[in-house]
């Protein structure tokens, strides 16, 4: 930061619920329910902006693919709970207390605990397909973007989704292999938008 004296804002994207400077429901040890924003403000003179990591990924995807005004960005990593970012009419939906997109709290009827299912391709398919089904009946985005290392055969997911939604048209399903690039773009976009 010393090398960049004109830097006016420090921005972080973090896993979990980011609300009023506090982080909750995160797997990062030592920050649960801590007011990270206040701690950083005490140390740095720059503005501090904190965002949920998958919300910024959703915004990054939207900014680079703006033809999709309504999208759902689903992140399902190995051995972790799922998270999502929601864009409706070109706007990021964070919801009350920034809970929108916390899909790991959905009362899905799963065959095992989500943490266990997320360790195998079959389990991941079960989680992702049921989240897609729920999403379609709640938000109905035209595009669902998915990051998951354990879904190598995307055709199987498309078939499972068609099976679950046999009476309705399914959205366009898009697999991304790198979520970091979308996080970076989305974080820069949101940060610049707030600073202006």
Where are each of the predicted segments found?
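Glycine-rich phosphate-binding loop of actin/hexokinase-like ATP-binding domains
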Residues: 69-115
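Flexible, active-site-adjacent loop/turn segments at secondary-structure boundaries
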Residues: 21, 26, 101-106, 148
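Short, glycine/serine-rich, charged loops/turns that create anion-binding
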Residues: 17, 55, 78, 91, ...
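ATP-binding/phosphotransfer module of carbohydrate and carboxylate kinases, centering on a glycine-rich
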Residues: 1-9, 43, 64, 92, ...
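Short secondary-structure boundary segments
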Residues: 14, 74-80, 147-149, 174
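Long, contiguous hydrophobic alpha-helical segments, chiefly transmembrane helices and signal peptides
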Residues: 14-15, 23, 54, 82-85, ...
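Glycine-rich phosphate-binding loop and adjoining helix at the ATP-binding site
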Residues: 1-70, 156-166
């Amino acid at each position: 930061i010393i090398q960049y004296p004109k830097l006016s804002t420090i921005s972080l994207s973090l896993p979990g619920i980011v609300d009023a400077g506090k982080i909750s429901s995160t797997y990062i040890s030592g920050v649960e329910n801590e007011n990270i924003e206040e701690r950083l403000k005490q140390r740095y003179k720059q503005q501090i902006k904190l965002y949920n990591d998958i919300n910024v990924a959703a915004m990054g995807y939207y900014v680079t693919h703006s033809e999709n005004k309504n999208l759902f960005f689903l992140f399902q990593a190995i051995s972790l709970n799922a998270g999502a970012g929601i864009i409706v009419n070109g706007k990021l939906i964070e919801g009350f207390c920034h809970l929108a997109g916390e899909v790991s709290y959905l009362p899905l009827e799963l065959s095992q605990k989500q943490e266990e299912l997320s360790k195998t391709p079959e389990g991941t398919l079960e989680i992702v397909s049921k989240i897609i089904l729920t999403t379609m009946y709640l938000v109905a985005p035209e595009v669902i973007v998915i990051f998951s290392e354990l879904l190598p055969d995307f055709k199987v997911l498309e078939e499972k989704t068609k099976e679950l939604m046999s009476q309705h048209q399914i959205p366009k399903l898009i697999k991304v292999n790198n979520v970091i690039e979308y996080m970076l773009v989305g974080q820069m976009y949101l940060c610049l938008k707030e600073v202006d």
